[in-house]
Amino acid sequence: MHYFPLHVDIEESQAPGGLRLNVHALGKAVYGHVIQVRDIFAEYLKGVSGHQEALSGLYGFPYLVLIWFQMLHGNQLLADWITDHIGDEWITDLPAISKLKVFADDEKAQTEFMNIKYQNKLRLAKYIKEHNGIDVDPRSIFDVQVKRLHEYKRQLLNILHVMHLYNEIKEHPEMDFYPRTFIFGAKAAAGYRRAKLTIKLINSVADVINSDPTINGKLKVVFIEDYRVSNAELIFAAADVSEQISTASKEASGTGNMKFMLNGAPTLGTMDGANVEIVEEVGEENAFIFGLSSDEVINFENNGGYDPNYYFNTDQDIRRVLMQLVNGTFSNGDMELFREIYDSLLTNKYGTPDQYFILADFKSYHEAQKKVEEAYRDEARWAKMAMLNVASSGKFSSDRTIMEYVNEIWHLDHVTVDMSIDLQA
């Protein structure tokens, strides 16, 4: 049995009556459980070839689609640079952006591309200084996670790892640590206590780290308040790393990862949601993948066997950051402020402990982050990765998606419209 936190009432007649079913839309209705929705209907419709074929085909399509207008408006420097190199066909036919691939190894193009990224980072750094009062180094890695705050999206994994990095720098000030700026942007539903507590944790960690002169600015944490379209445009253009770290099997699909891709930010993420398709397009060597697979997560959920206390008891790094939740390190000595988060990870006080497998993926996430740093230190390698992400983003076009629906799902006839007719006459 698959468990959904929301009951969806679908009359039996609806599925047999329709030859196509949008599992991504349905997955959104049940908080992103696309894998489970697909599997349920695959069983329900077993032997009905029309249904089965539609489910398998539609699963490959993005539920939401990327429109290039936001990049044209928010990243004019990159848009102009692309047009200078391949012409303007990509503006009306996004798959044409693949022509950029021939420049991925070109040293001059790489330098130009990285300079554009730097200019965009300067712009975001200025915004952060004006709105947050925090000085950030535009030469640091801008590691970005901006999205709705939800436990399955695992902003908590991100900030726990930031706490771990801070511990490492404090213990080993001589270590060769490439400077990082972790940028969060999120909004939480009004009644979502755990999400709001996570935002509090992010800001509390930021207060401690950003005010510690002993780490010499190697690490900064920024929470962008009132995350919205206007500041999102600045963030997407400036991001070096796109954090897409939801628990595998939980994310239906979104457009944030696609927007980061189009702006030249390689994905650090799980094989979940549209990340799967991004990796298919750009190649796993141009992304940083970690964590449990969807099958592994679903197996734990269905059959049990996951014990987060194993990681707490055997991994001293995990144990230390979790203890810092309840020893006042990041809460001005208040040992109760973040106890709910601590308990939710290790006890059944609030339901299944570590429901979203944060501790299981912590070490794998840390290893992926080390690979990010290694790649970023090689500017030519990083520039190539970033450029190939831009050049491989053509699939995530609304025009392409609609045409595939027209041809493969709806089977509509093409109609030629005579644009010379005066429709107002």
Tell what function each PLM region has:
Residues 1-425:
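Catalytic cores of carbohydrate-active enzymes across secretory and cytosolic contexts
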